[in-house]
């Protein structure tokens, strides 16, 4: 099951072009292709290699633009709902924990992140700027702004 660091293309586009060529990076981290072929893909970050910003990862998945606004395989863009699922439901599935986390439901751990605004109301190009107001993990507040 692929679990790519979704911001690699955002931060390292030029290195990928140098190593793989322009044509091959267009398909890299191809969540749209995963879906088309019935592959479940989970999204991740890879600290300290890249910042641990899931919202930057969401932005990259939805826009397929690097940090300079250059396109990286627009055909691999996914809707925001699919990108969120890759970080939540599919992330739990990847770690064999789908029975205890990944969704908000009775009997689940109830891990949750609260953003300062409705992500679906934000321009996709601005997702990386959205702040996290609160994070609850294992019933404990682990981040509060």
Where are these regions (language model features)?
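His/Asp/Glu-enriched, well-ordered alpha-helical/loop segment
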Residues: 1-121, 125, 130-138
